[in-house]
């Protein structure tokens, strides 16, 4: 079961420039900054109502974000849904025939656990599932 849209992830080349632009858009700076070594990204989170906008910058050339930008340029990378139990959600989606990207259950931002559903499974949209501790 999906609890809510947790955030929308946007891939950027330069985090400082993107932060400046989103600060202008939101009228204030980011609510959270973090480097997530396991995902090879630096992130900035802007709270927007009950959801958030996550800016993601690659920290390594083999990062999924670096590969995304090389192939598609900057822009929307994924939509993330909060789930109460990641294993149950993944089991349900696998049973439904959806392709889970390897590395499911890995460490995400703020101590969360995350998994990604391949965009081939959901008409061109990468979906992230997040479970908070």
PLM regions and their residue ranges:
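Alpha-helix N-cap/helix-start and coil->helix boundary motif
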Residues: 15-16, 62, 86, 123
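Vicinal oxygen chelate
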Residues: 5-13, 44-47, 54, 66-133
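Short, charged/polar surface micro-motifs in flexible loops or helix N-caps
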Residues: 49-53, 60-62, 86
